[in-house]
Amino acid sequence: MKKNLRTASICVQGGYEPKNGEPIEVPIYQSTTFKYDNSEEMAMLFDLKKEGYFYSRLQNPTNDVVAKKIAELEGGVGAVLTSSGQAANFYAVFNIANCGDHVVASSTIYGGTFNLFGVTLKKLGIECTFVNPNDSEEEIQKAFRPNTKVVFGETISNPGCAVLDIEKFARIAHKNGVPLIVDNTFATPINCRPFEWGADIVTHSTTKYMDGTASQVGGVVVDSGNFDWMAHADKFPGLCTPDDSYHGLTYVKAFGKMGYTTKLVAQLMRDLGSIPAPMNSFILNLGLQSLHLRMRQHCANAQKVAEFLQNDERVAWVHYSGLEGDEYHALAQKYMPNGTCGVIAFGLKGDRETAIKFMDSLDMINIVTHVADARTCVLHPASHTHRQLSEEQLKEAGVAPDLIRLSVGIEDVEDILDDIKQALDQI
């Protein structure tokens, strides 16, 4: 077993240890089911008394190898791949919270997640209070209720590029006896490992930087194994009391630090599905092998682009925490001293139509919903990803009407700058 590998080596070789004569690349187990020689062996799998595979809706060897690699990158004890980042965030919360429960979440999060927490979870009987992440601990504490079960935030918010004070949010969550979930999609474990700052569970849309090529849609939930569920057993009956659907098994008692991820697979994957296809996981693993190299280039290119935008008189404002004058620069230096990500938020002087004209004038840079892959792309969140929100909700989410989200890729930075310059000349 490979031990104590550094981050770059985990990207390349983590999660998979081929034996003598086996393929060097992770095999694709494109099979729905798995054969056993006797009935008793399969019965033990269904009772969770034996490790193994019997149906790919629950677990698949290809998926598990890639999940293990991501867990190693984040410093977690276990991980579960999902079919999308949205599924990962839903499962991470729904594995803890039930009908009648409450969630506290940062207001500066991705529009789809904002809607998931504010609308969809509400239909399931789970209410959410959104808080300004820049507020004091005392102010955020006011959002908590006796039935609060989890706190949620994004390391770097999408699309506003705000940096979460992870230690502060972890401190507040733990004071109230609940775990902190952090969506680490934009920073990736290359630039930030939230578990080292007190987070308990990490999620990703693996569709983004981890994949890097816009070739597959996926997500992942990673557990640190650090949260003491039994110390707050009254809050988390699903983890700390017998499960009637598994002959009275209690997940935390039976599986210890793996209790959270085991429950996620045994209950949520069993009942709701959302497992990725093995081929998608294979593609994701190819992306992970170069993640450390790509993030370095994303950050270097984004820094140069942000500095250019900051100095152009046609630009009204720029949010990129790599800039010394940015309001989140100090937090970025604390949590991500080696770089943040390739995403920049900025606004042009003028109105919403000015932003649209600029985007329509771009040549090499693509207008797409996607973000955080090898290609440089651009989006106007108020018109696209967040268009379902009201003006008040847009303000609460930190999405200004003039905000342009620029995801800087790994092309030659001079070509990126040339395209931005010619588009600015046309507004």
Regions found by a protein language model. Give the residues of each.
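Glycine-rich beta-alpha junction loops
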Residues: 16, 30-36, 225-226, 288-290, ...
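Conserved PLP-enzyme active-site core in the AAT-like
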Residues: 2, 8-17, 79-311
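Conserved small-domain helix->loop->beta segment predominantly found in fold-type I
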Residues: 272-275, 279-281, 286, 290, ...
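N-terminal "arm"/small-domain region of PLP-dependent enzymes with the aminotransferase-like
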Residues: 1-60, 68
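Conserved N-terminal alpha-helix of the aminotransferase class I/II PLP-enzyme fold
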Residues: 38-90, 112-120
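Glycine-centered tight turns that cap/initiate beta-strands
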Residues: 75, 147, 314-317, 364, ...
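PLP-dependent enzyme catalytic core of the Aspartate aminotransferase-like
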Residues: 118-119, 127-128, 142, 146-149, ...
